[in-house]
């Protein structure tokens, strides 16, 4: 199955045609799709109306520099700021993480979008792509935050996606533009990078997004291409039973693996449930790749639309203004 990207703030005839294909499980929204809060509500409704089946709508709304919806939404602080508070006041930091998660998830759901791919539970160890998106460099601190964030998102009625498994934070390279290789053995990864994922899974995380990183002392392929990582370690040893997403196949770290068709097949053959095709110019090739493959749409049913929530209802919720105020007082963020 595929989650695809669309080009703009309204749907083209070709994009409506893509949505008729059984292989299209949903749409990932980006800043290019955003003009205003009202427009996102309209686009979400138009996407659902155009599709002949339930459609999963997703976005990256982490806070900080990765926030696709902005005007009319809370300016969420990056997770690193919340992590820094943990040293002084762990209880207050974990409460803020819960509230950050609730606020983010509530605003996204009020816009008609099912989920934000969050939280990042990579370790903050200097990776160019992760940076301040990570809570901390300490696996056990990140594990505590992972559990609080899962609880906050679930309290808002949103499913949770832990990313980027098995950990993107301990390599320097940004997989958007480079191949990344982590040469540490599995024993080290299990005692460090996998700790937050185990905590998030234990807390009830619904999905995991794979990293486009190679761990050659565990498996020769990037993690998203690796049945060993997905089936043996994630589903086998760690007992994860939820949805497995690839990261975007347009990223440089996987671009050379058999083109779009080869990349899609490699992810699905390894055990990914859903492949992200975020660049519209790659969608036709991706659809050609999955023609004839069986689509397991049941895997995503639990991620779609957990009850109705609109902006009027959210704005009337007393928690909304109070949480915004607390985050503003601590980090200077606002709408």
From Swiss-Prot:
It is found in: Cytoplasm. This is Beta-hexosaminidase. Disulfide bonds: none annotated. The gene is nagZ. Pathway: Cell wall biogenesis; peptidoglycan recycling. InterPro entries: Beta_hexosaminidase_bac, Glyco_hydro_3_AS, Glyco_hydro_3_N, Glyco_hydro_3_N_sf, Glycoside_hydrolase_SF, NagZ_Beta-hexosaminidase. It catalyses: Hydrolysis of terminal non-reducing N-acetyl-D-hexosamine residues in N-acetyl-beta-D-hexosaminides. The lineage of its organism: Bacteria, Pseudomonadati, Pseudomonadota, Gammaproteobacteria, Lysobacterales. Belongs to the glycosyl hydrolase 3 family. NagZ subfamily. It is an enzyme of class 3 (hydrolase).
